[in-house]
């Protein structure tokens, strides 16, 4: 039983560095993880597979966090796909 079982996290910029480390840690604690990326579809797909290896749900969304309309759309899409957002990490 993980600290974040049943929670949904949205993390911006999680295909590398701190964002990816946070995504993997949250997944290891039981959170489903939605995350954004800007350029590399391949890196996003690798990250999805790494997160899913923890037995949780993962989905990548291409989005520029600096663009308000795109950020708004991602929030709506994540809520539709996951039902809610419990944790937000703006990386």
Can you annotate each of these PLM segments?
Residues 5, 54-57, 76-90:
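A glycine-rich helix->loop->beta "capping" turn
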